[in-house]
Amino acid sequence: MKGLTSKIPRALQTGSKMVCADNTGARVVQIVSVFGYHGVKNRQPKMGLGDLATVTVKKGTPDMKRKLVRAVVVRQKKEFRRPNGLRVSFEENAMILLNENGDPRGTDIKGPVAREVAERFPKVGSMATIII
């Protein structure tokens, strides 16, 4: 997995509910844990754009509900700054579901995807219709 080109603020924490932006059958997911987070006792794990997490499906089709799956953040409301000075923010927080190999589980991504995520996950970038 490649490093990110921008310094992304970690604006999402465990327990946050987010929109699922793919066609896997999940509509709303909740963050359970963050991959690679080594924190301090009693500190909530935080994550930002392009980070992997384990999520549980809160709303969706009956076969997807209450499942633990991997997901990556593709949009975040909190603005971040790119090295060229451009500030980017999205209207909502959104994730897409991944399998164990890091490939998308769905076949379609709804809405835009940040360029940093497309660089880190090439298969997500090839599926996205809009890359900002």
Curated annotation (Swiss-Prot):
**Is RNA-binding found in the keyword set?**
yes
Q: How does it assemble?
A: Part of the 50S ribosomal subunit. Forms a cluster with proteins L3 and L24e, part of which may contact the 16S rRNA in 2 intersubunit bridges.
Q: Which residues cross the membrane?
A: none
Question: Is NAD given among the entry's keywords?
Answer: no
What protein family is recorded?
Belongs to the universal ribosomal protein uL14 family.
Species source reads: Methanocorpusculum labreanum (strain ATCC 43576 / DSM 4855 / Z)
Task: Give the protein name, as stated in the record.
Answer: Large ribosomal subunit protein uL14
SUPFAM superfamilies cross-referenced by the UniProt entry: Ribosomal protein L14
Q: What does the record give as the function of this protein?
A: Binds to 23S rRNA. Forms part of two intersubunit bridges in the 70S ribosome.
State the InterPro entries in the record.
Ribosomal_uL14, Ribosomal_uL14_arc, Ribosomal_uL14_sf
A Pfam family name for this chain? Ribosomal_L14
Molecular function GO labels: large ribosomal subunit rRNA binding; structural constituent of ribosome
- List, alphabetically, the SMART domains matched: Ribosomal_L14 (SM01374)
- What keyword terms does UniProt attach to this protein? Ribonucleoprotein, Ribosomal protein, RNA-binding, rRNA-binding
Signal peptide location in the record? Answer: none
GO terms, biological process: translation
User: A cellular component term (GO) from this record?
Assistant: cytosolic large ribosomal subunit
